[in-house]
Amino acid sequence: MTKTLAVNAGSSSMKWQMYEMPEEKVLAKGLIERIGLKDSIVTVKFGEQKEERVFDIPNHTEAVEVLLEDLKRLKIVEEFTEITGVGHRVVAGGEIFQKSTVVTPEVLQQVKDLSALAPLHNPANAAGIEAFLNLLPDATSVVVFDTAFHTTMPEKAFRYPLPKKYYTDYAVRKYGAHGTSHMYVSQEAAKLLGKPIEETKIITAHIGNGASLTAVKGGKSIDTSMGFTPLAGVMMGTRTGEMDPSVFPYLIENDSELKDAQGVVDMMNKESGLYGVSGISSDMRDIIAAKDTDTDAKLAFEMYVDRIQKFIGQYLAVLNGADALVFTAGIGENSVPVREAILSGLTWFGIEVDPEKNVFGVEGEISTPHSRVKVFVIPTDEELVIARDVEALKK
């Protein structure tokens, strides 16, 4: 029996679970939310106990320090040497990494070099990996890539309609993200459908501060909403989602604060989405609390829902129908108003939601027996997938 720590760092959060392996027994788990925002929330659950604290955590490096301090303070571990493996979710693996890999100095540098494909994530991932390497030097560190699941996309889906040289010479293509989550929840949905996954057509909606949708056919990703970077696709907490690229040079020419292309990209990544439209917050909970009295918050909510509905419709066409639609991740699992708003616009497709199940259901089916497409809420478990990969690659 060994202890493995699975770490899932999002753009503004860090979710973790401590496992006893290979039994896959969860010893403790926690979540650090609102990293980089005021009043970060640190939650730790172990045994029958739960602890929650609120204080500012400015970056992912300090979040790692808080996590490890909590493990010792709460006696989840006596010594850090008990932790023999650490698995890290990394968003962008490009065309270099198509499977999970043990961290070496070369691998860490490649993760950093791929930051152009995930500017909000890979730098934070790399900072977290380095912090763990310094604090847990004897543990085997493994990187698990969000992009790996999407390597099954056909070329017609991942290529952009640009001259071929930009793909062959510069690897400009769609890579996607959240692959570990999309893979896990599609497998769980197949179980709920009672069908072999090879016979299923499933749309998975990973909706958190970052959000993406994937069309999964026969257990394989055939299209996904994020693109060359996680900036593409639906509207998100601080990200625009899809935009007309002609806006970029127009803004550079007309806004003196945006001096170059990188300035525009930074604005679209860090100051847009829910935060940019509402002017209040990147957190959906804050938007929902304000939308009945604040017109900008109301608009942000409506735009957010609109973009997700459009991608669901698109993937119903890509799959030629679907067996199931799955909601997962922070907003998808927990926000009744968001699910209700999205599903209310999909009735033409024969999707019927049971209002009572939607309000009270935290896991399982929330559609009616007559719904042509089953609708599930499935808590994602990227951490379990990560822990399994660490166990397989341990020294």
Swiss-Prot record:
Q: Which residues bind substrate?
A: R89
An example GO CC term for this entry is: cytoplasm
Annotated organism of origin: Lactococcus lactis subsp. lactis (strain IL1403)
Listed name of the protein: Acetate kinase 1
Q: In which pathway does it act?
A: Metabolic intermediate biosynthesis; acetyl-CoA biosynthesis; acetyl-CoA from acetate: step 1/2
Q: Which domain of life is it from?
A: Bacteria
SUPFAM superfamilies for this protein: Actin-like ATPase domain
Q: Active site located where?
A: D146 (proton donor/acceptor)
Enzyme Commission numbers on file: 2.7.2.1
Q: What is its main location?
A: cytoplasm
| Lineage summary | Bacteria, Bacillati, Bacillota, Bacilli, Lactobacillales
Q: Which reaction does it catalyse?
A: acetate + ATP = acetyl phosphate + ADP
Report the top EC class in one word.
transferase
**HAMAP family this protein is in?**
Acetate_kinase
Identify a single GO molecular function assigned to this protein: ATP binding
Localization in the cell = Cytoplasm
Question: Any idea which positions bind Mg(2+)?
Answer: N8, E382
Keywords (alphabetical) are: ATP-binding, Cytoplasm, Kinase, Magnesium, Metal-binding, Nucleotide-binding, Transferase
